[in-house]
Design a protein with these regions (language model features):
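A structural micro-motif recognizing beta-strand termini
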Residues: 17-21
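Short alpha-helix capping/helix-loop boundary micro-motifs
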Residues: 24-27
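Ubiquitin-like/PB1-type beta-grasp interaction modules and other compact soluble beta-rich domains
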Residues: 2-6, 50
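C-terminal structural segments of small proteins and small subunits
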Residues: 48-76
Length: 76
């Protein structure tokens, strides 16, 4: 399985699991990063430490270190 950090711009995937600490997991779930949800990479910043994802018709920015803990299955 791949992690969310491996998506290319405009590539879509489905979230398989969120493997983070309890507090971060709760925050991610509150903003829509839950198992079965579709997610799409919209933007990578120049410093490559933040990424913007579209999830539930909302654009959310995540740090790379957090996105590495979200396991995905790429859409076909």
């Amino acid at each position: 399985m791949e992690n969310l950090n491996e998506l290319k711009i405009n590539e879509e995937a489905v979230i398989v699991s969120v493997n983070t600490g309890k507090d971060i997991k709760r925050r991610l779930m509150d903003i829509g990063f839950v198992k079965g949800e579709k997610v799409k990479l919209i933007l990578k910043n120049f410093g490559d430490n933040m990424r913007a994802y579209k999830i539930k018709n909302t654009i959310m920015a995540l740090r790379v270190k957090d996105s590495k803990n979200i396991i995905i299955q790429k859409a076909k």
